[in-house]
């Protein structure tokens, strides 16, 4: 009789352990979904890798995970956590689409602060992440093109250009950015899109100068390509290097160097032709 009771207790204990293990695995999987979702949002939209790692780490810890380890580069995110039983789980997420939307980065940071304040469960956080993933771009292509023209126009003031240079740079900045967006959509290779856009800007600058529009062609071209200059990439690369994230820092700076090279080649090609 006692033997049967012991066997029954053992079965009950093993069943309880199995249920607890399945429950912990489900919870940990949800937490990893939240961590990888927030990290991917930040990486895709231009956040620095050290900021991504810090945010993902804090999210995992605030959800009760132990032994949290996060590693990110501009195109990948690796997260390892331990549940309360010591079981390790790892999630690898590949980032293929890189763009610049600091508004999404800010909203992802706000989401992580809500998690730190214990305002969101993993399911609620996943719903918020899904909303951010489906969010439409803040500005339309037409608005971006007009903004690019204004930015380039006012750069002529910084470079001590004339009012005629301001008008020419505004026109070329808008046209050049439109060429960049169109070629990026067709070719889907950023390097060639920037090369084509800078070539178009330099060629049109020569044409406008031939028509008597603008005074200093150097200031016009320099101002018109400013929206193509990888300022954010250079800043992020230097900040990653300063934070000892050497792999991501060097890769981001290499991308910025390629972009600068594409702009230079596009402009130099026009001057070599004329």
What is each stretch, according to the model?
Residues 9-120:
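Soluble N-terminal domains of membrane-associated systems
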Residues 128-137, 247:
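Cytosolic juxtamembrane amphipathic/interface segments immediately preceding
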């Amino acid at each position: 009789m006692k033997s049967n009771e012991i066997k029954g207790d053992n079965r009950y204990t093993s069943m309880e352990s199995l249920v607890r293990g399945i429950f912990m695995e489900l919870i940990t999987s949800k937490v990893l979904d939240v961590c990888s979702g927030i990290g991917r949002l930040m990486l895709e939209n231009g956040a620095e890798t050290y900021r991504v790692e810090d945010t993902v780490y804090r999210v995992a810890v605030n959800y009760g995970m132990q032994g949290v380890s996060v590693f990110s580069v501009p195109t990948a995110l690796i997260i390892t956590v331990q549940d309360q039983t010591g079981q390790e789980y790892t999630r690898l997420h590949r980032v293929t689409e890189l763009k610049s939307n600091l508004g999404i980065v800010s909203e992802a940071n706000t989401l992580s602060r809500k998690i730190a304040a214990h305002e969101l469960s993993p399911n609620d956080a996943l719903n918020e992440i899904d909303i951010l993933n489906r969010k439409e771009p803040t500005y339309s292509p037409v608005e971006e093109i007009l903004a690019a023209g204004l930015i380039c126009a006012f750069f002529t003031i910084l470079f001590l250009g004339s009012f005629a240079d301001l008008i020419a740079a505004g026109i070329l900045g808008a046209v050049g950015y439109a060429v960049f967006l169109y070629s990026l959509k067709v070719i889907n290779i950023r390097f060639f899109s920037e090369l084509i856009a800078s070539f178009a800007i330099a060629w049109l600058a020569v044409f406008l100068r031939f028509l008597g529009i603008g005074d200093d062609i150097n200031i016009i071209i320099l101002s018109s390509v400013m929206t193509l200059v990888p300022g954010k990439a250079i800043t992020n690369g230097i900040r990653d290097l300063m934070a000892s994230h050497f792999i991501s820092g060097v890769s981001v700076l290499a991308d910025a160097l390629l972009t600068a090279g594409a702009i230079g080649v596009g402009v130099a090609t026009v001057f070599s032709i004329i």
